[in-house]
Amino acid sequence: MDYIILDIEFNGRKFASDLPMEVIEIGAVRLNEQLQLIDQFSALIKPVYFAKLNKFIQKKTGILQTEIDEAERFPKVINDFQQWLAQSESCLFITWGGEDMKRIVLDTRMHRLDDQYFLHADYFDLLKGFIKHKGLVNDISVENALVELQIEADGHAHRALDDARMTSEIFKATFEHLDFSQIQQYKDSFTNAKERRLIKNAIRLLLSQKLEPTWPMFEEHFLQKTIKTDNPKKTAEIKQYFLEQMTKQKNDKTTD
């Protein structure tokens, strides 16, 4: 089995917008079972929306507008990428966090392409693995993880291929300490971290006031005021998360 260390860059925006963010660069390296680098993939992508990169993204990535203007669109690049992936009889994706798989799935859907390959692809979140191995509390960047491991960074941070290479060095250095029972597949999520934090805080507030946190109460006093729920799937996910967190916090309070 090969290991595909994946990194993507996407077009962030300074101001909020209803238009989707898009992948603008895919970088990946292929390691064999002996953790030797045997191949690599790199491609820029010309976005449909925000085709003109803002100054923040240009400064962060070093990607030039002329390079983006000359790049292929997502359907061509993702097809090339899947052909490159097919050279491995089997593979496990290694990512730093869960955003890379999410953005590829979302862009695949945006372009009305078949998303089944990436939905069923196994991946290991090296960020979580590294945090568990080192006993850390907060997330850490690839650059700081390299410092922690006393590995000299080689490349330009926030360029997909260079980040994939640097992530592969972390993977190799920590391989024997990683818990591969945590391999997962992409799961659709309609809420973000901020919204899930609001839910937990609301339950905590209700409990502190000696009130029973019920879904109707949360829906009336918190949900309608703080979270946009025009998607029924999102509402269902919020309700499920609320019920899980309510049970967890009540149990924690009982055992205190």
Give names to the regions the model predicted:
Residues 1-19, 33-36, 69-92, 97-256:
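DEDD superfamily 3′-5′ metal-dependent exonuclease/proofreading module
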Residues 1-61:
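Conserved RNase H-like, two-metal-ion catalytic cores of nucleic-acid enzymes
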Residues 63-67:
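Short glycine/proline- and acidic residue-enriched helix-loop micro-motifs
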